[in-house]
Swiss-Prot record:
Reaction catalysis annotation: 2 [molybdopterin-synthase sulfur-carrier protein]-C-terminal-Gly-aminoethanethioate + cyclic pyranopterin phosphate + H2O = molybdopterin + 2 [molybdopterin-synthase sulfur-carrier protein]-C-terminal Gly-Gly + 2 H(+)
EC number(s) from the headed UniProt entry: 2.8.1.12
Assembly: Heterotetramer; composed of 2 small (MOCS2A) and 2 large (MOCS2B) subunits.
Annotated protein name in UniProt: Molybdopterin synthase catalytic subunit 1
SUPFAM superfamilies named in the record: Molybdopterin synthase subunit MoaE
Lineage: Eukaryota, Metazoa, Ecdysozoa, Arthropoda, Hexapoda
Length: 155
């Protein structure tokens, strides 16, 4: 089963872990991406996320299909991404994968976050502390439609 969600609510890691748990699985691997308090010497106070929601969910489902093709023993996959305001230390994305053994779930989670960063249409804006400059929308250099990606790859 795939558990995909875009939400403005706080992400609960334990809840997502419970969604993917299964009695036939001896492994659940998790990736939790959180808001850090700094970037390029500036103090970050929060991130704001926006998404093209229908396309984001479709792309997340395609990632799940790819995970299942590469690691057929995977049981459940959870990908939850937060939208709106995400303060420092809170989770913006949680990816959870269950499988009978750890190798598949660990590799799948690593692949999933890389693919999510490359292909899912979610954008973030950093809000800085007072006096440290304006907030700014961040380009995801891994994203296939970014200028940085195009400059470094032959299309």
């Amino acid at each position: 089963m795939n558990y995909l969600k875009l939400t403005f609510d706080k992400l609960e890691v334990g809840e997502i872990n419970d969604l993917v748990a299964h009695e036939s699985c001896g492994a659940i691997s998790l990736f939790v991406g959180t808001t850090r308090d700094n970037f390029d010497g500036k103090t970050v106070v929060l991130l704001e996320y926006e998404a093209y929601e229908a396309m984001a969910l479709k792309t997340m489902n395609q990632i799940c299909e790819e995970l299942r093709a590469r690691w057929p023993d995977i049981k459940h996959i959870g990908i939850h991404h937060r939208l709106g305001t995400v303060p420092v230390k809170e989770a913006s994305v949680v990816i959870a994968v269950s499988s009978p053994h750890r190798k598949s779930s660990l590799e799948a989670v690593h692949f999933a976050i890389d693919e999510l960063k490359k292909s899912v249409p979610v954008w973030k804006k950093e809000q800085y502390a007072d006096g440290e400059g304006c907030s700014e929308w961040k380009e995801n250099k891994e994203c296939s439609w970014s200028k940085s990606h195009r400059d470094n790859h032959i299309l």
